Amino acid sequence: MSAVTLTTYTEDDVTSWLGAKEVEKGRAYTGQVHELEVDDQRILALVSGSARQPYTSSARLVHHKNGRISLISGCTCPVGVDCKHVAAMLLKAIDER
């Protein structure tokens, strides 16, 4: 079985990292994702939301020695991490593969 990477993760992975509620909210924002950048180390995007300026969202994966994979995310929205903007960015990256 291959290790999950930023170019191979699935929507099920996103749900396990962020929860079904954030994924549902994020799905409505996938059309608001701009300047999406994906590489081996991180995903970065601007996501339009309720603020005048778009939020900057980012994510990277951490592969633990025990085999567990966790997502480290950040966003300039008031929530700050693991939010609907991060979910939208991750879902949009899947859509654009």
Language-model features: where?
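Long, low-complexity, compositionally biased intrinsically disordered regions
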Residues: M1-R97
